[in-house]
């Protein structure tokens, strides 16, 4: 099956379903960015269009970013040496931590990986119109202000 998938340049799931879905050609727009995270290995995939993707045998679904008032997910932003210093008052324990901070601009996206028992601090260029998202170690996706 793997060899057939390579020859046809079609993923195995599409072969098994017997259908090939072609996405309509729409311009990519960072306002439509979608996040896909594997629950097994934590792999993160982003796309500006709906895609069919799998990882570790799991079909991935795009997550809808939720708003939260939880103070541990609210960034504290200060200026430092011509850059933004973004920090979170999150305990960052092994049981729960901020795994990724994602910043989205009109033309680019940046993913910063964070780790348990590490201070939740990121330095970013001073750019206006920045949107931020947090993905937790438990796979929750939050839009943060």
Segments (PLM) and residue ranges:
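Short metal-binding segments enriched for Cys and/or His
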Residues: 60-77
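Exposed aromatic-hydrophobic patches
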Residues: 85-88, 119-127
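Residues immediately within or flanking Cys/His clusters that coordinate Zn2+
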Residues: 35, 52, 133
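Edge beta-strands of extracellular beta-sandwich domains
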Residues: 139-145
């Amino acid at each position: 099956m793997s060899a057939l998938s390579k020859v046809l340049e079609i993923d195995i799931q599409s072969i098994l379903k017997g259908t090939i879905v072609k996405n309509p050609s729409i311009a990519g727009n960072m306002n439509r960015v979608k996040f896909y995270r594997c629950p097994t290995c934590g792999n993160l995939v982003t796309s500006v269009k709906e895609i069919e993707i799998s990882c570790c045998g799991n079909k991935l679904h795009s997550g809808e970013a939720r708003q939260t008032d939880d103070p541990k997910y609210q960034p504290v932003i200060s200026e430092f040496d011509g850059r933004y210093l973004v920090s979170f008052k999150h305990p960052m324990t092994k049981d729960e931590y901020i795994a990724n901070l994602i910043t989205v601009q009109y033309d680019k996206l940046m993913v910063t990986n964070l780790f348990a028992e590490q201070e939740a601090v990121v330095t970013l260029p001073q750019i206006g119109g920045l949107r931020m998202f947090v993905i937790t170690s438990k796979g929750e996706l939050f839009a943060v202000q």
